[in-house]
């Protein structure tokens, strides 16, 4: 099994600011890391896959980086609509693993 540890658990920033979320894997997962955004009552939305590739239709304000065991999601020029919980995700041997989530609170 792969354990994904996200930090921080919660972060607050103002509109126009920048937020950085880290995800640490318990073993080398190369670049097999995705980031999802989830809002209450909605399914998760894929933002980034293969660590740094932006999913179709996703704003370039979202940037993923890292490889191996250390990964980062950066959200710049924050908007109120970015308020959500963000999860990192990977897979191994047909199993899917998620981080514990990071709640992003946007002050506007």
Curated annotation (Swiss-Prot):
Keyword Flavoprotein on entry: no
Superkingdom classification of source: Eukaryota
Region entry Complementarity-determining-2, spans: 50-56
Keywords attached to this entry: Adaptive immunity, Immunity, Immunoglobulin
Region (Framework-3), start-end ranges: 57-88
SUPFAM superfamilies given in the database record: Immunoglobulin (SSF48726)
Alphabetical GO biological process terms: adaptive immune response
InterPro entries to which the protein is assigned, alphabetical: Ig-like_dom (IPR007110), Ig-like_dom_sf (IPR036179), Ig-like_fold (IPR013783), Ig_sub (IPR003599), Ig_V-set (IPR013106), IgV_Light_Chain (IPR050150)
UniProt-annotated stretches for the region Framework-2: 35-49
Region of interest: Framework-1: 1-23
Region Framework-4, annotated ranges: 98-107
Region of interest (Complementarity-determining-1), ranges: 24-34
An example Gene Ontology CC term for this record: immunoglobulin complex
Region named Complementarity-determining-3: 89-97
Miscellaneous field: Residues 109-139 of the constant region are identical with the corresponding residues of rabbit 4135 kappa chain. This chain was obtained from antibody to type III pneumococci and was isolated from the serum of a single rabbit.
Protein name: Ig kappa chain V region K-25
Species for this entry: Oryctolagus cuniculus (Rabbit)
């Amino acid at each position: 099994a792969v354990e994904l540890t996200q930090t921080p658990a919660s972060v607050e920033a103002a509109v126009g600011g920048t937020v950085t979320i880290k995800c640490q894997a318990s073993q080398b997962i190369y670049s097999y890391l995705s980031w999802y955004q989830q809002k209450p009552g909605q399914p998760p939305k894929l933002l980034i896959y293969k660590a740094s590739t932006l999913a179709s239709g996703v704003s370039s304000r979202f940037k993923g980086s890292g490889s191996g065991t250390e990964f980062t999601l950066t959200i710049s020029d924050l908007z109120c609509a970015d308020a959500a919980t963000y999860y990192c995700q990977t897979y191994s041997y047909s199993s899917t693993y998620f981080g514990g989530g990071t709640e992003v609170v946007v002050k506007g």
